[in-house]
């Protein structure tokens, strides 16, 4: 779809959506997003220029259907997939991608760390994906030197980052905000550093006793990104891994640096979103969202969860969806899903489905709470179908039609029950929606009550 859009841009020094927007040029991607979000094209261009909205769209991802992440657009959901040294293969990851897209993932991150050829699995995912693909390049940087931190050089990091851009990755998590002076602040935490990328860079800094190379070479990374229109997803290496560690000095020190890096990227006209926690008590979620907006000049916020309790292994998709809905309500632009396997193992296809549906609910609830135009239309349509016992319409409008139909049919599988004015909960005699009271009857009752009040 995008080949004809991209062709005139080839060879230019800066092909980012932000660069075009700041120069007053409405790209085809901006126009596409405007129609998708039912917003004026001029607003999309203005928000991209300001940095409050991003359109992750690498010029080498030609089958991409552009989408937006930002406060002006719908709250989005990301799904993580990826092979590990202990499980999965390329075909399984491609199937997870297709399943994620089927159940509504707005973006997908390939977090493969080994067990497969990382370049091949990434290329296969990008070729099959109509949604933006994100990656974490430090994983492959470490894998490229067979896990030897002492052999990992600054140039190795940049080489892998550019390789991901060349393949068509739309956004990359860059852990540039973790500084060597932040590391002592981790003392006193229960779970220390829980970010894999952050852990790799912490080890690198401790081993070499040098500053984070992603920070010192940040301008070089910007130069790479603007050639491909790859978007920064600034990683939160010091995100809290438990409630005890939430909103501590380590997390907030890194957040301040992430704000500095956001503005540095904008000087290059490179798009940015900022990643956030993690594990956060409910009463601290609003503070975390507001603090990010303040420190990062309202760049889109992208949070993992957050989980609101630490005692829900096997059900972390529920614990985190509670936090995600609140974060979305307060202004977070994208929610990274958590599956039932979080903290326990590599998610399979069913885990991907469970996590995505939980997060589509959270994002949709946030859009309703923020009074986005049309956000509740589908809810109202389903409610009318429910009141009229239109079972097939109810299934169709559900976030997971297959699951809704499956649960209904467990007790009433015959087709005749798709027209029945009851379900197996109340049966045919006790459903309160069966005895419908007409508006005319209610008006007559109202008149009689008013007469009684008047005569009294």
From Swiss-Prot:
InterPro entries: ThiC (IPR037509), ThiC/Bza_core_dom (IPR038521), ThiC/BzaA/B (IPR002817)
Sorted UniProt keywords: 4Fe-4S, Iron, Iron-sulfur, Lyase, Metal-binding, S-adenosyl-L-methionine, Thiamine biosynthesis, Zinc
Entry annotated with the keyword Lyase: yes
Molecular functions per Gene Ontology: 4 iron, 4 sulfur cluster binding; carbon-carbon lyase activity; zinc ion binding
Annotated positions binding substrate: 80, 109, 139, 175, 195-197, 236-239, 275, 302
Signal peptide residues on this chain, from the entry's feature table: none
NCBIfam families: PRK09284.1 (NF006763), PRK13352.1 (NF009895), thiC (TIGR00190)
Record flagged with keyword Cell wall biogenesis/degradation: no
One Pfam family in the UniProt entry: ThiC_Rad_SAM
Listed EC numbers: 4.1.99.17
Protein function: Catalyzes the synthesis of the hydroxymethylpyrimidine phosphate (HMP-P) moiety of thiamine from aminoimidazole ribotide (AIR) in a radical S-adenosyl-L-methionine (SAM)-dependent reaction.
GO BP term, example: thiamine diphosphate biosynthetic process
Family named by the database record: Belongs to the ThiC family.
Name the record gives this protein: Phosphomethylpyrimidine synthase
PANTHER family, alphabetized: PHOSPHOMETHYLPYRIMIDINE SYNTHASE, CHLOROPLASTIC (PTHR30557:SF1), THIAMINE BIOSYNTHESIS PROTEIN THIC (PTHR30557)
Residues annotated as binding Zn(2+): 279, 343
UniProt pathway annotation: Cofactor biosynthesis; thiamine diphosphate biosynthesis
Organism for this UniProt entry: Prochlorococcus marinus (strain MIT 9215)
Residues at which [4Fe-4S] cluster binds: 423, 426, 431
Co-factor(s): [4Fe-4S] cluster
Substrates-to-products reaction catalysed: 5-amino-1-(5-phospho-beta-D-ribosyl)imidazole + S-adenosyl-L-methionine = 4-amino-2-methyl-5-(phosphooxymethyl)pyrimidine + CO + 5'-deoxyadenosine + formate + L-methionine + 3 H(+)
Record's GO cellular component terms: cytosol
Record note on cofactor: Binds 1 [4Fe-4S] cluster per subunit. The cluster is coordinated with 3 cysteines and an exchangeable S-adenosyl-L-methionine.
